[in-house]
A protein has these predicted regions:
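Amphipathic, interaction-prone secondary-structure segments
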Residues: 40-91
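Intrinsically disordered, low-complexity segments enriched in small/polar residues
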Residues: 17, 60, 75-78, 97, ...
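N-terminal domain-onset segments
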Residues: 1-61
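Acidic, proline/glycine-rich low-complexity IDRs
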Residues: 62, 85-122
Length: 122
């Protein structure tokens, strides 16, 4: 996937209502716009990645214990600790994490949906 197609999918998601809870003292609308801006600022050049479900994700979220192929669309944290992944087959977003060493495996939180902001905020 190229950057333009990823941006189209992300922006379509951000244009829909979100299930993201307001965890601030701000009015909900302002909080959501602030969080959308943070996500947009964290977008990266799309890259193909592989991720693995954590034990919790297989037991509680029904993910199969296998390697999954995704497109990484956003990253934050030290050396890309937290990631927003996109499944191009379904346009669902997943949150993932990995250690600070680039060679470490990427693990899926487990939840996924077409709500980019909700998944990004984990």
């Amino acid at each position: 996937m190229n950057r333009e197609s990823v941006l189209t999918i992300v922006e379509a998601s951000l244009s829909r209502p979100t299930g993201t809870p307001n965890t601030s003292d701000l009015p909900r609308d302002k909080f959501i716009e602030q969080e959308k801006a943070k996500l947009r600022a964290s977008l990266i050049e799309p890259i193909q990645v592989q991720a693995y479900p954590s034990e919790w994700a297989t037991e509680q979220c029904g993910l199969a214990d296998k390697t999954y192929d995704f497109v990484a669309v956003a990253s934050e944290g030290d050396s890309g600790t937290y990631w927003l992944l996109l499944d191009p087959a379904t346009n669902d977003f997943y949150k993932a994490w990995r250690g600070v060493d680039a060679g470490e495996k990427m693990y899926l939180l487990g939840y996924h949906s077409d709500d980019a902001l909700t998944e990004w905020r984990g």
